A protein has these predicted regions:
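Nucleotide-activated donor-binding/catalytic signature segment of Leloir-type glycosyltransferases, i.e.
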Residues: 83-105
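A short, well-ordered alpha-helix in the C-terminal region of glycosyltransferases
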Residues: 172, 179, 186-201, 207
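Glycosyltransferase donor-sugar binding loop
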Residues: 68-87
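Carbohydrate-associated surface elements
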Residues: 18
Length: 222
């Protein structure tokens, strides 16, 4: 950005998007029923079908018999045929009874949804500029599994709350999910590390103070 604007790097301040932490109260222990979660628009670009495929693979491996899939997010009339296609896929695999699909949640419903997840994944097909849903999952104390593209590497590496996989590796997501689900205690510890990182670096209350400091810094130094 500094190069594009032809200004000194010392003149640039990084100020990420943030969230209000009110209501985010992560569980201290792993959920009784292991649950893989998705919270984003229910559309191909966000990779919902890729997550459904990964879930089917995990179930068919025989290592995750009690694993459930919880899907939530915005859904428009345009998205309905795609979502119906995922339902058919899950029905054919004999797994539809272990899957919940809850479109268009309000904030309180979203908070409760996130609290009950063991691991969170949105395998977006394009590089996300940020991905607020990742910050929300981490704030809820849920470890994340994401493609190594866009803003995801920076968020995951800063928060230490999840795993990245090569988006060109068809098995990368499934293997990363499997490794987290195999060790619930380590997964919960990873999620709590992510929660603490979000509280420190992405809370709106702290970001507001940081923004004021960034604005006033040139004035005070002149």
């Amino acid at each position: 950005m500094a190069e594009r604007l032809k200004i000194s790097e010392d003149s640039v301040r990084h100020h990420p998007n943030g969230i209000t932490l009110d209501g985010f109260s992560p569980r201290r222990e792993a959920p009784e029923i292991p649950t893989l979660g998705y919270l984003a628009r229910l559309c191909p670009l966000k990779g919902l079908d890729l997550l459904v495929d990964a879930y089917v693979e995990l179930k068919q491996s025989g290592k995750h018999e009690s694993l459930r899939l919880a899907i939530a997010g915005g859904m428009t009339e345009e998205d309905e045929p795609f979502v119906d296609e995922q339902r058919r896929k899950l029905t054919q695999a004999g797994l539809i009874d272990q899957v919940s699909i809850a479109p268009n949640l309000d904030r309180d419903q979203k908070l409760e949804f996130l609290r009950n997840l063991s691991v969170f994944s949105v395998p977006a097909r394009y590089p996300e500029a940020f991905g607020l849903y990742v910050i929300e999952a981490l704030a809820a104390g849920v470890p994340v599994v994401l493609p190594e593209s866009g803003a995801f590497p920076e968020i995951v590496e800063n928060a230490q709350g999840g795993k990245l996989y090569d988006p060109n590796d068809s098995m990368g997501q499934t293997q990363s999910l499997d490794s987290i689900l195999q060790d619930p205690s380590a997964a919960k510890a990873m999620g709590m590390t992510g929660h603490e990182a979000v509280a420190e670096g992405y809370a709106n209350e702290k970001l507001a103070l940081s923004l004021v400091d960034h604005i006033l810094e040139p004035i005070h130094s002149s």
